[in-house]
């Protein structure tokens, strides 16, 4: 079975073709700010990104013939984890999503390309809005603002299943804390195959990250909102996009920050250590959700390649549970394997409503 995988990100479009479990093509096409700035809204990039996929297939001599097309899921309504067919309800909710992110293009592009092929379904799997929270985890200090969760569900669940397989058990039999360290940082508590607690890693909860502010002092935030200094859009950027490390240090480049630290930059050292401190504190808090009975802590994402960060993080959290590190992201493989599982009848295809 041949699967086409499409993963639009904020600064890249990732494309893969799988023949069963074997990758035939994996490409990561980077986009400059200038290249994307000609599109007023992210959704306006649809044709541009779709054509990139087609051009990449043609350039690599891959016939446009697939048994399924799967895209990275968008920021639709909260849904349980799993594989979903892209239907009209999902397309409409994606087009009118409350939050903007390039991932919203994944299912739309998958659906359009699949529609041009005979008997070819379009899927998404484990989008960032996967919501399996316990009811107690939904309550915030204000009924006006119930907790929502937006996190790296696809990568976290893929890493959880990989770890379980390595341990000779099943994801559904483990209690895990998983931390994805990337442009955003998400920390989720996985209990017997469900993420019963996770932060909103996109716009305003948890530790700060290379480009996101995380939890902020609410009173000060209100004062800034009414100061007249910023528009609504400018403030949103200062929470997600131009926040975190880039707000403090002018860059999201963690290796460059570490190099500056090694050359004696004390401010860079303080800010990066503060991010590590906040991540560790959040992981420690997550352990209380499981009453301290944690089988393992899994660290993943692009920043997990950094020995500087991982060693300092381990120093703070190693007393909680065994730590396993899975650098990078397994999103393309995970999407492909989810599509294969659906085609083979091993995974149920859920209906988005």
Curated annotation (Swiss-Prot):
Its EC number is 2.7.2.7. The keyword Nucleotide-binding applies. GO terms for biological process: acetate metabolic process. It is an enzyme of class 2 (transferase). It is found in: Cytoplasm. Its main location: cytoplasm. It catalyses: butanoate + ATP = butanoyl phosphate + ADP. GO terms for molecular function: acetate kinase activity; ATP binding; butyrate kinase activity. The keyword Cell membrane does not apply. This is Probable butyrate kinase. The lineage of its organism: Bacteria, Pseudomonadati, Bacteroidota, Bacteroidia, Bacteroidales.
């Amino acid at each position: 079975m041949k699967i086409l995988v499409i993963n639009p990100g904020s600064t890249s479009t990732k494309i893969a073709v799988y023949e069963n479990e074997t990758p035939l093509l994996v490409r990561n096409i980077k986009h400059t700010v200038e290249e994307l700035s000609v599109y007023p809204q992210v959704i306006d990039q649809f044709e541009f990104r779709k054509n990139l996929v087609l051009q990449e297939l043609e350039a690599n001599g891959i016939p446009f013939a697939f048994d399924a097309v799967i895209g990275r899921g968008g920021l639709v309504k909260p849904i349980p984890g799993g594989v979903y067919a892209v239907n009209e309800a999902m397309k409409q909710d994606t087009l009118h999503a409350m939050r903007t992110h390039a991932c919203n293009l994944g299912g739309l592009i998958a659906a359009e390309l699949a529609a041009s092929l005979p008997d070819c379904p379009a899927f998404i799997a484990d989008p960032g809005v996967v919501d399996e929270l316990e009811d107690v985890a939904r309550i915030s200090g204000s009924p006006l603002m119930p907790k929502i969760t937006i996190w790296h569900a696809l990568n976290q669940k893929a890493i959880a299943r990989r770890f379980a397989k390595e341990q000779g058990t099943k994801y559904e039999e483990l209690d895990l804390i998983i931390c994805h360290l990337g442009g955003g940082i998400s920390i989720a508590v996985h209990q017997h195959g469900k993420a019963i607690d996770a932060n909103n890693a996109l716009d305003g909860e948890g530790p700060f990250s290379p480009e996101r502010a995380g939890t902020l002092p609410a009173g000060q935030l209100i004062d800034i909102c009414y100061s007249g200094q910023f528009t609504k859009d400018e403030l949103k950027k200062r929470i997600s996009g131009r926040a975190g490390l880039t707000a403090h240090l002018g860059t999201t480049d963690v290796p460059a920050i570490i190099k500056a630290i090694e050359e004696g930059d004390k401010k860079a050292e303080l800010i990066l250590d503060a991010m590590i401190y906040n991540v560790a504190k959040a992981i420690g808090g997550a352990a209380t959700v499981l009453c301290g009975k944690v089988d393992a802590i899994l660290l993943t994402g692009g920043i997990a390649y950094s020995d500087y960060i991982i060693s300092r993080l381990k120093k703070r959290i190693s007393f909680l549970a065994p730590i396993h590190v899975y650098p990078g992201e397994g999103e393309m493989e995970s999407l492909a394997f989810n599509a294969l599982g659906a085609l083979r009848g091993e995974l149920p295809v859920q209906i988005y409503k």
